[in-house]
Amino acid sequence: MKKTLIITAAAALTACSNVPAPQLQSMQSYQVEWIGERPLIDSSMLTLTLLDSNRASGMAGCNTWTAEYQLKDDHFSLDSIATTRKLCAPALMEQEQRFLAALADVQRWEFAEHQQLLLWPAQGAPIKLWPTEQSDQH
């Protein structure tokens, strides 16, 4: 009986280790929930979409943004971030600047519980994002 239980437990553990880890997917969009230690301003929309050809884009709250990204294993970084230049309310503009600065500082990614994407800077708390429906944005 003990031997059967041990074999069953070992088989179950082996099966769990064969589940592939979730990966970042191109053409997937994410909606930002937190920037570091702070939640978003109510009704503001910040997004990130990973496009083909190592491009990313999204909404920064007031302006749209685009960048090149590098992805290798759990390392992730955004380079050459560019935005449109609309003006919005001061609080929204401040949040947008924090978001863009946080994006520029991202060094790695991971999925937390329930497929929440965490983009980690060199120091401090991550940007927290949730997946949205598949996107056709370009």
What are these regions (language model features)?
Residues 16-138:
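Lipid interaction determinants
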